[in-house]
Amino acid sequence: MNLSPIQEEIVNTSGNLIVRASAGTGKTHTMVSKISKEINENRTHKVVAAITFTIKAAQEIKDRLSVDVTRHFIGTNNSFVIEEIIKPFMKDVYGSDYDLDMSTDYSKEAKVDTFQAAIEKIKTEGILCSYTDNKKNFIFELAQEIVEKSVACRLFLKAKYFKIYIDEYQDCDKSMHKLFMYLCDTLKIETFVVGDEKQSIYIWRGAYPEAFVSIWHKENFTTKFMGDNFRSCKQIQNYSNLLYEETRSLYSPIKELNNIVWLSTTTTAWSSEVLKYIDPNKKSALLRFSNDNARLGAGELSLNGVNYTYIPQTPIAEITTDTAWLYSAIAKCLIIEKYSAYDLISEIPVEGNETRKLVSAIKRMLKKIEQSIDDEDGFYSATNALATYLGYATKGEHLKKLFETITDEKYHVAFEPEKYQHIAITFHSSKGLEFEQVIVFAEDYRLSDVSSLCNHYVAVTRAKSKLVIVKLSNYNANCFQANLAKIFAKSGVSINDVLIQR
């Protein structure tokens, strides 16, 4: 895949750089190209850190990179500060009582109210936990404390890293932002930031999109804007660009308005009406705010002749300990035909070492887990044996969730959603995905606050060639219509200039 002129500029720009990347602009491809180039050009012993929010996103970056990344850090925000700052240097600041094995547990049962209580939990239980208030971030507060007070930590980071790349920066909270800017401004580690405040769908859990905007105005950062949406057709681009001030200038009127369908309909007729505009031979997705509405919507659409598969949240998705990746990998081994022991090893958070002995042992243990599927206790024992072999701890309640995920076939679709032509899913789960056709409900987005606007932007920009907006007669849907009209009016445009209401 070739680079566009703006992508070339980004790849070739040195120094601190912030990129505002609208939906569908090839952000990951650009970042991976930049990382590859800068690793290849590096002539020092130093390495890079590529940091993102999920293990899945980190794995995608690893898979796309054509260079050897064995020495480099590619992982999640939390794993970066835990492995590179907290575990090795906490004892420097807090004393030898904290020179111990630590694991994470962000579950509800492990949460605490104060910084001191969280520190005490590490000392007594060896557990890195989180706050009851999900808008506060203990892990990054602790990392900040350590890096500011430990000379050895600062020297280590400066000596090890020549560049840090941070993905999805709009989802960073205040504590993350403070630490990343400390690494950049105080430790002088070159920093690449990419994000888009229009796509901040995690404000409810502490995401602080203003952090991204503040970097945009920093004098020590070069700024670049990626606005060319290679995913969506022109009409859908126009619609999404009008939602935000920064992209309104990209709006350009067109004559053909057949790619967006606005359906004013009823709760009983909506599914049959929608299917008049959906091509059953092209992939489509119903995106809803709640899992319940996605499930019910899939049922109604299926009853009207097009089979929609509801993609549920699996029981193991709720697990937040540092063993979570392993439960997911075991489930994939037993559910996905082509997922192997090698794939599991590649997902080990610390770089997997594919020795023949390791692969053989993991294959043997996975076989034992598979053979125990009809014996719940045997399944728990076999899974625990693999976890212990890899240095991870299990919990009884989590083993139960894994067993349920694997034995209840309704959850299997969640591991291979791309296999299905038509799916129903929450728009939070759709981030990073794309579909030829997308169905959304007006009532899910009142457009009266930043969060609602971001959610709507993310949902509509999943669509390539067709967007169906279902407008029922209720308060939230009416708010959506009124607020959308106000937003479009800022550009001197009416809703009817952008789409046809049916």
Which residues does each PLM region occupy?
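The feature marks helicase ATPase cores and/or their adjacent C-terminal helical subdomains
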Residues: M1-R502
